[in-house]
């Protein structure tokens, strides 16, 4: 299986707790036989908004749609909210949602979704809830317990956190198992693509 992680950290990778958690997730996926691509949003040039812009993000989204089995949002908590970088990814996928409605085909029916939140404050459930609502509306399947909360601060401490490692192992297993089930079942072939609200 192949998974794409959109890393919404506000800091550069070498300074980012969120990126450190993304690396642990990628390493665990590799251990379980899956591939991972981490896209760090603050390191690419792209437009914010809901249009089909020709920028560095567009080929990444197209690569995801064509070649990946699952998507993961990774974000720090900032004042109880997810980062603006992840908001910009959600905005850009709005175009995919509009295309899906117009063409009566949801490419994400064959994909799973999970989310990773890092930070020491409250807000995990609120952020996961927003992400999971977005994902189900775009046709993703959400495996049980497909979320990670990383409260530990500092890269060295994150790497040593045994409880976090257990949580990541479970997260990756759930994502991999359900991605394989969905790929085999091919819901894009059989699921309802026509909107009933039109």
Regions found by a protein language model. Give the residues of each.
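Short, glycine-/small-residue-rich phosphate/pyrophosphate-handling segment
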Residues: 104-148, 166
């Amino acid at each position: 299986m192949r998974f794409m992680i959109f890393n919404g950290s506000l800091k550069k990778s070498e300074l980012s707790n969120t990126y450190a958690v993304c690396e642990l997730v990628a390493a665990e996926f590799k251990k379980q036989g899956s591939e991972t691509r981490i896209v760090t949003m603050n390191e690419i040039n792209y437009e914010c908004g809901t249009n089909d812009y020709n920028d560095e993000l567009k080929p990444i989204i197209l690569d995801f749609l064509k070649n990946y089995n699952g998507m993961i949002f990774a974000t720090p908590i900032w004042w109880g909210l997810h980062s603006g970088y992840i908001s910009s990814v959600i905005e850009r996928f709005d175009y995919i949602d509009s295309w899906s409605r117009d063409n009566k085909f949801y490419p994400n029916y064959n994909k799973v979704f999970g989310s990773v939140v890092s930070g020491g404050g409250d807000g995990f459930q609120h952020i996961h809830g927003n992400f999971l609502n977005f994902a189900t509306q775009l046709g993703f399947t959400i495996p049980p317990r497909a979320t990670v909360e990383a409260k530990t601060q500092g890269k060295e401490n994150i790497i040593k956190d045994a409880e976090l490692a257990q949580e990541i192992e479970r997260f990756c297993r759930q994502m991999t198992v359900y991605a394989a089930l969905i790929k085999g079942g091919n819901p894009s072939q059989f699921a309802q693509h026509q909107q009933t609200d039109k």
